[in-house]
Amino acid sequence: MHILKFRRFSLPESQVTPEALVFNRRQAMAVGAGMLAASPALAQQAGLPPAMRNTRYVPGRAITAEREVTTYNNFYEFGSHKTISAAAQRMPQRPWTVRVEGMVENPRNYGIEDLLARMPLEERVYRLRCVEAWAMVVPWTGFPLSALLAEVKPLSSARYVVFQTATLPSVMPGLRQSWYPWPYTEGCTIAEAANELSFMVVGAYGKLLPPQNGGPIRFHQPWKYGFKAGKSIVTIRLTDQRPVSFWEKIQSQEYGFWANVNPAVPHPRWSQAQERMLGTGETVPTLLFNGYGEFVADLYTNLQRERLWA
């Protein structure tokens, strides 16, 4: 596999999302100026502890409008269409428990409020690239997965981390589609989980993460296609066996385990060379590893025989 050297994101002004759809220009110009405070008043009012913005990860594109992000959603437990946001409001967000188990020294249950209180929360503006060739930029609030793993202490034999989504038949009508291999399960290697970009998300736009976006807690690895990001997580399991994830079980030729973004490797039914920005409809070139190669390319240098791209 040919590994390239990557530069930080950059786009000409003409390709930036119109100001009406994003945060104001002062906020946009503040990106890159250091660690910036998210609005503590807004966060506290919304039930989310205040979090500082980490500007190490510069997205190179303007933030997508909150309205677009919260009303255009893939969440098959609520339906196989994009307009599930209203139906998802029926999913209870409190109480919520995440079980961390498997090959760890300290398996335990975490209440969501416990995680909000004890984990090192920060805001990160990340890109998200869907395998369906659309994309968005979101200010997520959360914590590095590595912080959680440090508490449970993985055994040396652990090789993979598996994420399982809640199954709540009373509020998730999509679960009646019995041909799908519920529950929704995804996974990554322990090395990928320990990477600094791997992020457990509990908020967006300075507010608690809404249910249609995977609230109260989801996972995000911005260099991978979006289907790798488990939503509404109830179990995190460490294992020595590579998991077969939800979409891989359904169609392994189209959706692989690694699912790293690569514009040069098409999906069997469409090109991945470009992506449509949510909200504006603008088409822009897709970047290898979604533009995060400088942080993750070295994870794959010895895996040339693996199908690293979905």
Model-based region annotation:
Residues M1-F23, G34-A38:
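N-terminal secretory signal peptides
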Residues S14, Q45-A46:
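Intrinsic disorder/low-complexity segments enriched in polar/small residues
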Residues L21, R25-Q45, F219:
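N-terminal export signals
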Residues A46-A310:
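Structured, non-membrane catalytic/scaffold regions adjacent to prosthetic-group chemistry
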